Amino acid sequence: MNLTSIVGKAFKSRQKELLLHQQGAVALQHNVLRNILKQGQNTEYGRRHNLSSVNTYQQFAQSIPLNTYEDLKGDIDRMRQGEKDILWPGTVQWYAKSSGTTNDKSKFIPVSKAGLKNIHYKGGSDCVSLYLENVPNSRMFDGKGLILGGSHSPNYNVKNSLVGDLSAILIENINPLVNFVRVPKKQTALLSDFEVKRKLIALETLGKNITNISGVPSWMLSVLVEVLEQSKKTTIDEVWPNIEVFFHGGIAFTPYRKQYEQIIKSPNMHYMETYNASEGFFGIQSDLSDSSMLLMCDYDVFYEFIPMSEFYNERPTVIPLEGVEVGVNYAMVITTSCGLWRYIIGDTISFTSINPYKFKITGRTKSFINAFGEELIIDNAEKGLAYACKATNAEVKEYTAAPVYMDENAHCRHQWLIEFTRFPDDISHFTQLLDKHLQEINSDYEAKRFNDITLQHLEVVVARENLFHDWLKSKGKLGGQHKVPRLNNERKIIEELLQYNYNSEVKD
């Protein structure tokens, strides 16, 4: 009997539990809410909102307002100074550094001990449970897992708190037993210089029996390329012949899938998506033949949803899980044991099923183009690019897009800045196909493109090699959970990138 068969027995009871939970998700959610409310009564925030008198979801929704980071920032700042019982009972030592708001360079998301145990680590364990259920002949524990994390700093001039990328916090606090099946060593994993880190990871993993890898697709790809360079091999499965799964999250995998398939040729390779963020762990791909993810309903996370059609209303409709419908684009709202109360996380999702509750990430509440009523979201962009790439034998490495509100000819259009790993057979044809497919999948975009009256044909600017890497490096944002903003209603980001893109060539 191999080691995976032995270790796998520890996950059997949870596999059965998850199967039963799929049928009782709503009841589980109300249990979660009751438990969080009970804990919240013992906090300053709970007393402020009279949580001791809240017994039902309706009372909860009436007592606590919807919150953004700015709304909770004052309380979080006090927690970081060491004050206790503010948003969550006791003191919270760890804070996950996340991309900033309009007013601040960074957000510092509290990560309580309860949140680590009952959200983040529970999610990691369930990934393994669901993977082993999908792949019963797995041998993943016969080797080691490469976990690609960010870095953490001991403070940000605040002596009572520790700050870092979520992945670094998880590595720092992980059960010591996990270190026996994990690489690289902690010192390497927590390095802040990503370019040094990836070289060291490559050196440390050569000759190791790596069976599974975990991380953000863009940064992991960079590490794997370095592994190939150091090993002088052409495929990863020549270096690690027993590699079998990539647990990925953070950004959409679709633009990177082809590149992974080119460097990992093994027919036994699997890809499993997760939805984890600084704010919590929310979804796992429970069926490898279905790209949707299962909403994890028995963690310390209570979910609510705002239809995006109402998101910018003064008083939008907010619904609990039992009120969602398939195919509607929702902004997600969470209440967690990390002290996030009715927190608008900034992601949008669409349910593909409600029995069980399965969904796909569709984008960000602030990452879209709606300059002319076209309501283009990331899900549209990813599908449009995939369609154009397939038809023109192209591969996209990175991209961003923004509107051109009016050029010298008084024309409005969308401008796409795209870095290719494989250039299209015909860039003009690629551009036409992208524009065509966006119209096919987005009726609002189609209406605005009608006869070129409101919107002209989109424009593609070809990015030079490593443009986006160099731009992120200039911002000090290599590695970890940093990512390129895909869609933006404003031109600030794309203008910065265009300035970096010397000798770029505009294609129609």
Where are these regions (language model features)?
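Non-catalytic, beta-rich accessory domains that mediate macromolecular interactions or localization
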Residues: 84-85, 104-115, 238, 245, ...
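Short, basic alpha-helical nucleic acid-contact segments in DNA-binding proteins
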Residues: 123-128, 289
